[in-house]
Amino acid sequence: MFLGSLSKMDKLLSFFYHIPPMPTVKKISILEIMRNSQKGRDYVEVDVKKVMEHLNEIYQCGAKPDGTFTRMAYSREDKKGREVFCGYFEKLGIPTRVDQAGNLIARMEGTDPSLPAIMVGSHLDTVPDGGKYDGAVGCMGGLAVCETLIQEGRKLKHPLEVVVFTDEEGFRFGSGLLGSSALCGEELDIHPEDLDIEGKTRREVFEGCGMSVEHVAGAKRDPESIHCFIELHVE
């Protein structure tokens, strides 16, 4: 998916980082991150056991008896997974909202409300028989940061937003990155009468999720409102 959509991904990266599109992205190993974090820096550790518990709970939203699972965008399983994810933030007292593109966004305020938000997240929708951790790890990583900050009684200077992007995989209608593209203000090639793999129109599917095809572009964010975007991604 990334190789086939490199041009669009470059544009998304340029939006979040306020820099021209780059031909390559630097890879940083976990060991390097760990070494840097120990060089006199103030840091806290997340509860890995709790993260795994959350991942297993989300996994059940779409799990099949044969051990595989599917959480297709806009499906009952996708909705359930998002409801479970929202529940974690509700317990923390962190408000959530859904924008016009269906992106689920939780926001933890910082100490300086004038600063742009640090955005962390990924997606929860999957391809058929998808990977257990694909996308979900990025979402849970953002949740873990919020849980840890609250547990430690800390706050960031910047607001922290955890986002679950809508329809990243694009399996249902044949085109992905809808939520992130809408948030970045990309031109969207979507139409009310587009048919999904089950023969349902996009309008029908969107309305079933409380969305409107005509209003998806309203999810566009001002680049100045986002300080940076971080995604923890595997698989």
For the regions a language model picked out, list residue spans one by one:
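Intrinsically disordered, low-complexity segments enriched in serine/proline and basic residues
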Residues: M1-F2, L6-S14, P20, K26-L31
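Low-complexity, intrinsically disordered or signal/transmembrane-proximal segments
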Residues: Y17-H18, Q38
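A non-catalytic alpha/beta surface segment that caps or lines the substrate-entry region
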Residues: A63-E109
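Acidic/histidine-rich catalytic neighborhood of metal-dependent amide-processing enzymes
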Residues: V127, V137-E235
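N-terminal capping segment at the start of a domain
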Residues: M34-S75
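General beta-strand structural signal in soluble alpha/beta enzymes
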Residues: T96-Q100, V120-S122, V162-V164
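Catalytic-core environment of secreted peptidases
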Residues: Y88-L92, L104-V137, G142
